[in-house]
């Protein structure tokens, strides 16, 4: 081994929730670990907290709730004294009014007003009398359930903002999963009975289910958790190589270890070696850096991502709304969701005279939004807040922009086959390589699910063989909505669930 090369038991690519969980737990078991992180300043990935002039921004919003007792215990171990309990509140904002989220049909009809709600009901009855016969797409499924008018108000705009494709190109199975339990007919009938005093316990068209009324949150944002994990890893005597990206990884058969070349921002390279490699880097990037080139390289290049940016505005005002965030169902603006950072934690906003909100825009890396200047994005966000009637632009006193590439793995019509091909080849060729986390597995994981995959990867290393299947950890669409924290003792909580995201329909030949 060259003197320039440094050896560790395990090399970890990426210091997000999955990478940091793996690094911390491996250190507890006595393994030497090197973590390689592209960001020169911060760990935490999409779960980091960004600070600007004393203001703290949560990128995407992270409620700390998990049904996995192992995950909850790890959070408490890392941050024993810094969690606060926060009220849970999210609503839909449409034409100057707030609507319940999850959507409650009778509440929606009441707030839409007599004329609009009447038109919605006519549209609903028309859909019931003349339903779409060939229901394969998201739009046709929703229209059959609620009518075209309610579809246009509460489903079409936001869904297309998030995923960047028309609703007619999304599959109906995703709609059925995401909107289950909501019935307009039941809601109207229930409302009539209530008006006659015949029903004292409204279900408002929703199946009765328990929603979280509060959640735990690190008092200085989610990055506080991952900074604590970093500090514990360093206390174990392990190391971080910040501002470095994976350049090439190859298995040295003669030496029996990985040889990993990493590159700093200035172009300088260095080599590390390790017995095991854990990657939370995007699948597309990992495969492109493996040598020799995997046969599944074309599959990796076909994987796509949805990107994301937050424009934080400081406003001379009281809080614009009490919610953690609101969903914007207006097609006249590009913003998809707005966070109120103080509602997450008062310590996120240092000045009581100012409000601080984060306008979230979904985009593709390199498109017009992503490529806009920070000044242009701050001006856009200010104008859109004013257009929505939420603030006077003259009250905006500052702003900052945070870009997050590859925030969401795209589930198009072919992604599953691509991932299966990549997984089959890499598992057969590299028994000591494990892929973890959201981007590392191209799966729409919450941070607790990402942590679970890392926990299983660590068990495989500790036990000396690939006994635990990381890919058995599924995603739960309602994980933050129902159930009690720590209900399940371990990763089994996620093995019985699936979080669907929209799939693009195949075009007819």
Language-model segment annotations:
Residues 378-382, 386-427, 433-435, 479:
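Flavin (FAD/FMN) cofactor-binding core of flavoprotein oxidoreductases
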């Amino acid at each position: 081994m060259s003197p320039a090369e440094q050896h560790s038991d395990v090399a970890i690519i990426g210091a997000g929730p999955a990478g940091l969980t793996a690094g911390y737990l491996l250190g507890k078991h006595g393994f030497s670990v090197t973590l390689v992180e592209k960001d020169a300043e911060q760990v935490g990935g999409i779960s980091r907290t960004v600070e600007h002039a004393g203001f703290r921004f949560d990128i995407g919003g992270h409620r700390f709730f998990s049904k996995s007792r192992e995950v909850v215990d790890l959070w408490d171990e890392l941050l024993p004294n810094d969690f606060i309990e926060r009220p849970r509140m999210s609503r839909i904002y449409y034409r100057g009014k707030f609507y319940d989220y999850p959507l409650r049909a009778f509440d929606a009809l009441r707030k839409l007003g007599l004329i609009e709600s009447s038109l919605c009901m006519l549209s609903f009855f028309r859909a019931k009398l003349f339903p779409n016969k060939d229901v394969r797409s998201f739009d046709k499924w929703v229209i059959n359930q609620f009518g075209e008018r309610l579809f246009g108000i509460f489903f079409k705009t936001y869904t297309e903002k998030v995923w960047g494709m028309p609703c007619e190109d999304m599959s109906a199975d995703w709609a059925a999963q995401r909107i289950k339990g909501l019935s307009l007919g039941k809601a109207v009938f229930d409302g009539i009975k209530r008006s006659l005093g015949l029903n004292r316990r409204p279900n408002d068209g929703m199946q009765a289910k328990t929603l979280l009324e509060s959640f735990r949150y690190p008092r200085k944002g989610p990055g506080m958790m991952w900074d604590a994990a970093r500090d514990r890893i360093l206390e174990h005597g392990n190391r971080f190589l910040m501002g470095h990206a994976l350049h090439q990884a190859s298995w040295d058969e003669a030496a029996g270890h990985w040889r990993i070349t990493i590159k700093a921002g200035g172009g300088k390279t260095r080599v590390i070696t390790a017995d095991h490699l854990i990657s939370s880097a995007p699948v597309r990037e990992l495969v492109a850096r493996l040598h020799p080139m995997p046969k599944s390289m074309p599959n990796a290049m076909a994987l796509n991502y949805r990107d994301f940016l937050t424009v934080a505005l400081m406003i001379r005002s009281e809080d614009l709304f009490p919610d953690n965030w609101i969903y914007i169902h207006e097609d006249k603006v590009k913003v998809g969701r707005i966070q109120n950072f103080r509602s997450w934690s008062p310590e996120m906003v240092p000045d009581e005279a100012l409000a601080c909100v984060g306008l979230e825009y979904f985009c593709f890396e390199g498109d017009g939004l992503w490529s806009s200047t920070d000044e242009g994005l701050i001006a856009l966000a200010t104008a859109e807040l004013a257009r929505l009637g939420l603030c006077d632009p003259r009250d905006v006193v500052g702003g900052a922009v945070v870009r997050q590439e590859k925030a969401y793995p795209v589930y198009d019509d072919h992604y599953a086959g691509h991932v299966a091909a990549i997984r089959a080849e890499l598992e057969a060729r590299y028994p000591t390589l494990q892929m973890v986390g959201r981007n590392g597995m191209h799966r729409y994981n919450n941070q607790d699910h990402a942590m679970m995959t890392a926990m299983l990867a660590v068990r495989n290393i500790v036990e000396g063989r690939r006994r635990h299947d990381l890919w058995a950890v599924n995603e739960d669409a309602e994980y933050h909505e129902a159930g009690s924290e720590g209900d399940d003792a371990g990763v089994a909580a996620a093995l019985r669930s699936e979080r669907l995201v929209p799939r693009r329909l195949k075009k007819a030949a």
